[in-house]
Amino acid sequence: NTAGILDAYHPLLETDEALWDRIFAVNVKSMYRLTQLLLPEMLQRTSGTIINMASIAGYVAGGGGVAYTSAKHAIIGFTKQLALDYASQGICVKGIAPGAIQTPMNTADFAGDGKMAEWVANETPVKRWAKPEEVAELTLFLATPQASYIQGAIVPIDGGWLLK
């Protein structure tokens, strides 16, 4: 479950209900609906892996505006509760919390003079943005049998951002 959109870093008083609903529809409700659709089949097989894409914004403020940050917190809570509820039935549930990943979603950060992208890289302990392939490799590993004992964990891939 990896659908996600940003909210242009809007604080609460700049976030109308339509924006809030849109962020939650894409980031949270899509995850809920897809999981609800596929989970019965996984339970019937007593096997399955669900990987939800959260964000470091699900741990700390500052990775997005109020709607995005709230949605990413919701994803973490959903992931942990789902993991607890279905672990004994053979369902492995975990999440990934990316930090600064250079994707089309972050194109605006690189626009113009690119000061935002430069600032983010400088604030990240490893001093760079991650490539999407780095997140893909982590996702592939988490889907393997070798990662089957990882249950309910949210794995950060953030260049050390959460260390600060």
Give residue spans per PLM region.
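Alpha-helical segment proximal to the catalytic Tyr-Lys
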Residues: 40, 84-85, 148
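Short, small/polar-rich loop/turn modules that mediate ligand/substrate recognition or access, typified
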Residues: 87, 92, 150-152
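Substrate-binding pocket helix/loop in short-chain dehydrogenase/reductase
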Residues: 10-12, 19-21, 116, 120
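Short C-terminal tail/terminal secondary-structure segment
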Residues: 6-9, 60, 140, 151-164
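Active-site helix of classical SDR
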Residues: 35, 71, 79
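C-terminal helical subdomain
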Residues: 95-98, 115-146, 150, 157-159
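Catalytic Tyr-X3-Lys loop
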Residues: 13-32, 47, 51, 75, ...
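Residue(s) in the substrate-gating loop at a strand-loop-helix junction
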Residues: 55
